[in-house]
Design a protein with these regions (language model features):
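Proline-aspartate-enriched helix->loop->beta-strand connector
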Residues: 205-222, 229
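A short helix->loop->beta-strand "cap" motif at the edges of active sites that frequently abuts
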Residues: 30, 157, 237-241
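Conserved beta-alpha
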Residues: 74-98, 156-207, 211
Length: 301
C-alpha cells in the first residue's frame, strides 16, 4: 500500500515487526529496515515523505515500549510482542555478518553462503575496519590492508557506515577493529547541511554502489536518513540489508552514553535521556509523549 498523504498515517495500519525471532527470519538480499518510536510517529504525522518512507519500507521495527503498548491498546493490525531497539538491530546484523566472516575464513572460500541462527541475537561480537571513505571520494586501502593474507582479505565481509561526522566515524572504525575482527569497515561522511545538492546525492550513491557492501547503515538522524534512503532506494545497486539507525552511530562510537540496562529493561530509556539532556530533550519527550498519547486516543476512537 502506498501512502500518499500524512493524513492517512496511522499506527494501527502499519506492518510492524513482531519479535526478534521475526528479525532473525528476515530473508537475505536488499531490504530497507526502519525503526519507529513515539517521536518518529509524531514527526511522520506532519511529514508526508517521512510517512511514506516508514510505511513503504520493507521492515518497520518497534523501537519503543510506547509503540508496543499502544499497538495492543488500539488493537493495531500488527501486535509486536517486544521492543526491538535500533541497537538490537545493529548488534544482530553485525553479529550475523561477523559469524559469516568467521566461517568464510575457516573455509577459505570467498562469498560462501553462511547459515545463521537465532543465537546471534544474544552474542556481543563486533566488527573490524580496514578502509574508509569520506567526503566525496573513497580512500585507498591502508598499507596494512594491502599486506594482509589474500585469502583472509578476499573472504572478508564488508559493512558500510554512511552518515555522521569524521570524528564519530573514526571512533566507529577503531571500536569495530576490536570487536568485529572478521569484517571490513568502510565509512562515508556526507556534507553537513540540511539538504543535499544533486551533486552531493550522486557522490553518496556512487560511493555506496562502489563499495557494494554486505551490510549498510545510514546514520543522519530521523527523518532525514529515512527520507533520503527511501527517495534514492532504486539508485542503490546493492544486495544487502540497509538499516536507518542514526543514534546507534553515537552509541557505538561512545560519543553518547546509552541508558544502563535497568532503565532499558523497564522501558525508561527515554527518561534517562531526558534527565541527562533536559534542555535538548524536554520538548521531544514531555510535549512529544503527550501528543503521542493524544493521537493514540484518537486512533482508539
Amino acid at each position: 500500500m502506498i501512502i500518499n498523504s500524512r493524513l492517512m498515517f496511522r499506527l494501527k495500519y502499519l506492518n510492524i515487526l513482531g519479535s526478534k525471532a521475526e528479525l532473525a527470519a528476515l530473508p537475505e538480499g536488499k531490504l530497507l529496515i526502519n525503526t519507529i518510536n513515539a517521536h518518529s510517529y509524531n514527526t511522520a504525522r506532519k511529514d508526508e515523505l517521512f510517512a511514506e518512507a516508514l510505511t513503504n519500507g520493507d521492515v518497520l521495527i518497534p523501537d519503543g515500549v510506547s509503540i508496543v503498548k499502544a499497538c495492543r491498546w488500539i488493537k493495531a493490525k500488527r501486535l509486536p510482542k517486544e521492543r526491538i531497539a535500533g541497537w538490537d538491530l545493529f548488534e544482530f546484523e553485525m553479529n550475523k555478518l561477523e559469524e559469516c566472516g568467521m566461517k568464510n575464513v575457516e573455509c577459505g572460500v570467498n562469498g560462501e553462503e553462511c547459515g545463521m541462527n537465532n543465537s546471534s541475537l544474544d552474542n556481543s561480537r563486533s566488527a573490524s575496519a580496514d578502509n574508509s571513505c569520506s567526503g566525496k571520494r573513497l580512500y585507498e586501502p591502508s598499507a596494512k590492508l594491502k599486506t594482509q593474507n589474500s585469502k583472509l582479505r578476499s573472504s572478508q565481509r564488508t559493512v558500510m557506515f554512511m552518515g555522521s561526522s569524521e570524528k564519530v566515524l573514526d571512533l566507529i572504525v577503531k571500536r569495530a577493529a576490536e570487536v568485529y575482527p572478521h569484517l571490513k569497515v568502510v565509512t562515508y561522511s556526507p556534507p553537513y547541511k540540511p539538504e543535499f545538492s544533486d551533486e552531493d546525492n550522486k557522490a553518496i550513491i556512487d560511493a555506496i554502489n562502489a563499495v557494494n557492501p554486505d551490510l549498510l547503515w545510514i546514520g543522519m538522524t530521523a527523518p532525514k536518513q529515512e527520507k533520503w534512503t527511501y527517495s534514492h532506494w532504486n539508485e542503490l545497486n546493492i544486495h544487502c540489508h540497509v538499516g536507518t539507525i542514526g543514534a546507534v552511530f553515537d552509541f557505538f562510537a561512545g560519543t553518547v552514553e546509552r541508558a544502563p540496562i535497568w532503565w532499558q529493561r523497564h522501558g525508561l530509556e527515554w527518561l534517562y535521556r531526558l534527565l541527562k539532556e533536559p534542555k535538548r530533550m524536554w520538548r521531544r519527550y514531555i510535549i512529544g509523549n503527550t501528543l503521542f498519547l493524544w493521537n493514540m486516543v484518537k486512533e482508539k476512537c
